[in-house]
Amino acid sequence: MDSLRSNGAPIHVTAYDTEGSVLKVREALTDTAFRKHNAIIAPDNASQLAILAEYGKNNNVKVFNTFLVRDKSYLTNPSVMHGNLPSALMYRKATDALMERLSYSTPVFVSFKGENGDKAEFVSALKQSLTDKGNTFMNIEVDGRLESADLRALPTDGNYTFIPTSSRQADLNRIMPGIIEWRDEAVTPMVRLFGYPEWTTFRGETLDNMHNLNTTVYSRFYTHEDAPRTHDIDAKYKKWYGNRMENAVPRQGLLGFDTGMFVIPYLLHEASSYDGVQNGYFFTTAGDGAGSYNDALYFINFRPGNIIEKSRI
């Protein structure tokens, strides 16, 4: 609220504890004070969201779905604002953006013998895009752990983007040391690593190796812990509440901050975009008679020297 005082209008925020109960939600809808609100930030429960979405549709009240990524009510309800880029659209957008970056690089897909990677859908879509455009790519299947010897067939004057078929940290740790060793031995090749939203949670040696390999990942959100805006909000949070904000991924405190910083100006000025500390909001209409969804997606580049760059796709 402290950051929203300059918006030029009084702000009234009410919090309701649904207690995980549909009955509590229905009870809230009968409250005279509740019916004066212009927007609802819905809870993380599908049944409760459905009730609120129907209320929003019948009363011309925007219902903001921040938590339920797989919910599809925005497709048929003009009052629902879907706060996350839907998965199918996320894969397509990430694939299209990556294709531009692969213009001068050979993609090398790395998988493990006898193991199914958890990113088969994304990898399949990317390979299809490469094939459609006539771009070549390579597949390397390794047994247990990638060794530098597994890469010796690659010309050392090449430019390569390694793409694991798994997002799991244990699998990434079985891949990166071998790539680093091969690159350092070969001296000349240009090497990058491309990966997944889950990688933004990795720390320690895994993160160090990601920086070493100039790694880029796609993600709906990211918090740069050392950014001045992050430090400023952390300091204000501790001042107001006495404790440090919970450090999770995503950070729920920052999610609340960014959501408030978007929703209030949206109600006042119909602003459809906001580039937040952690979450960005760039809404687009899903079609005639439909609601809208958040189109925000980012590339996070972990560069050598512990440099982190966040850019909107």
Task: Describe each PLM feature range.
Residues R35-N45, F64-T66, T106-K113, D157-M176, ...:
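Periplasmic-binding protein-like
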Residues M81-M176:
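Extracellular/periplasmic Venus flytrap/periplasmic-binding protein
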Residues I41-A42, A46-S103, E115-F122:
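Extracytoplasmic ligand/sensor domains, especially the bilobed periplasmic-binding protein
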Residues I175-G253:
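Extracellular/periplasmic periplasmic-binding protein-like sensory domains
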Residues M1-V13:
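Signal peptide-proximal N-terminal region
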Residues P10-T32, G144-L154:
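Structural motif
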Residues Y74-M81, L146-R152, W199-L213:
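Glycine-rich, charge-decorated loop segments at or immediately adjacent to ligand/cofactor-binding or catalytic sites
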Residues N243-G253, G260-R312:
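Segments of small-molecule ligand-sensing domains
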